[in-house]
Amino acid sequence: MASLKVFSFALLIVLTFSVIGMIYNVESGGSLCCNSHPKFGKCNTNNDEQRCNRWCHNGCGNGKGGYYKSMSHGGQCHYYC
């Protein structure tokens, strides 16, 4: 009976940390999809847009790729949703 209580408690702890981790990822912008990524660098040419699309295609699980998004401080690579 004691081992069942220990197992239940351990499972509860694991599930709690899993949920906290998922919430932290969503709030911190951990997802690559649907976000702009300045670390890719500025996009200026058609070649950069193709490179951005390939980079996003490999980095996001939805397989949709990305595009060059014009912004006030220069273009950035943005993942499709």
Curated annotation (Swiss-Prot):
GO cellular component: extracellular region
Signal peptide feature range: 1-21
GO biological process, one term: killing of cells of another organism
Cellular localization per UniProt: Secreted
Chief site of localization: secreted
Disulfide bridge partners, by residue number: 33-81, 52-77
Entry-linked Pfam families: Defensin_like
Keywords: Antimicrobial, Disulfide bond, Fungicide, Plant defense, Secreted, Signal
Superkingdom per UniProt: Eukaryota
InterPro entries noted in UniProt: Defensin-like_20-28
Assigned protein family: Belongs to the DEFL family.
Protein name per Swiss-Prot or TrEMBL: Putative defensin-like protein 26
Organism from which the protein derives: Arabidopsis thaliana (Mouse-ear cress)
